[in-house]
């Protein structure tokens, strides 16, 4: 009798969840995150840990010449090199159904990635990012303030803003090849338009005009959902919990 009772208890414990509970189980995604200019995958370590702790898979790509790969820096590194970095990581790790997230300059990169391998991408998410059309470069997109800034920090083929000049700190932002800002993006694959996309605009109410509002408007014009969160341009540092919640909501 005791044996039968124990067997029934075990049966209850291993019985499958009711259908309603199974439907409510959280979905887990594969995120590939592309950082912004001067940065590196290191800047997304905390976000990686938070998403991984919630059951997701996270791949942080560091673009050639930046972050822990700054020893490969060269003024010959261009936009295509950075697109190749992400494409090859996805292919070599055999990743599929990827939620591809690009922050800031990373928007240039992920646009090229979706054009190359749309079949591997579940959704592309632009996080306060550049959203280029074919034939555009970072520098060709109209923005007088950006053009003046780039001109003021260009040295010997690199972009060297003041905050990257302290070489005693690790990890840190590092100089980036100017060519990554001047190379033109060429989009040739119409299948990229079938990939779901979304835009996240971070904004500070006291900052107007917002330099990324034009890209949120582009996204809205394409019929994409646009999400807004109050934050500075670096939510991966300053508003981590809110960013993780929004990244989970978007897919």
Stretches with model-predicted labels:
Residues 101-102, 106, 110:
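Gly/Ala-rich beta-loop-alpha elbow adjacent to hydrolase catalytic centers
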Residues 75, 115, 119-121, 125-159, ...:
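Flexible "cap/lid" loop of the alpha/beta hydrolase fold
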Residues 57, 65-98, 115-116, 141-143:
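Active-site loop/oxyanion-hole signature of alpha/beta-hydrolase fold enzymes
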Residues 203-230, 234-237, 242, 247-250:
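Conserved loop-alpha-helix segment in the C-terminal half of the alpha/beta-hydrolase fold
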Residues 5-15:
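Bacterial N-terminal signal peptides
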Residues 62, 98-99, 122-125:
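Residue in the alpha/beta-hydrolase core beta-strand immediately N-terminal to the catalytic nucleophile
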Residues 26-68:
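Conserved HGGG/HGGXW glycine-rich cap/lid loop of the alpha/beta-hydrolase fold
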Residues 171-190, 211:
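Active-site nucleophile elbow and catalytic-triad environment of alpha/beta-hydrolase enzymes
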């Amino acid at each position: 009798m005791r044996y039968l009772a124990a067997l029934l208890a075990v049966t209850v414990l291993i019985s499958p969840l009711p259908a309603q509970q199974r439907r409510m189980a959280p979905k887990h995604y594969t995120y590939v995150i592309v950082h912004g200019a001067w940065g590196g995958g290191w800047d997304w370590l905390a976000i990686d840990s938070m998403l991984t702790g919630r059951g997701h898979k996270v791949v942080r790509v560091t673009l050639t010449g930046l972050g822990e790969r700054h020893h490969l820096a060269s003024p010959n590194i261009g936009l295509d090199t950075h697109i190749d970095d992400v494409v090859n990581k996805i292919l070599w790790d055999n990743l599929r159904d990827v939620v591809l997230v690009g922050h800031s300059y990373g928007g240039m990169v992920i646009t090229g990635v979706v054009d190359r391998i749309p079949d591997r991408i579940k959704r592309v998410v632009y996080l306060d990012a550049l959203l280029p059309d074919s034939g555009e470069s970072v520098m060709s997109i109209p923005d007088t303030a950006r053009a003046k800034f780039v001109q003021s920090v260009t040295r010997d083929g690199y972009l060297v803003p003041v905050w990257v000049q302290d070489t005693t700190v690790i990890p840190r932002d590092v100089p980036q090849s100017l060519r990554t800002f001047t190379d033109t993006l060429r989009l040739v694959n119409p299948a990229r338009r079938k990939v779901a996309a979304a835009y996240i605009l971070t904004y500070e109410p006291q900052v107007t005009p917002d330099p990324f509002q034009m890209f949120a408007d582009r996204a809205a014009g394409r019929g994409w959902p646009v999400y807004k969160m109050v934050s500075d341009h670096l939510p991966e540092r300053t508003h981590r919990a809110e960013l993780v919640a929004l990244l989970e909501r978007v897919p």
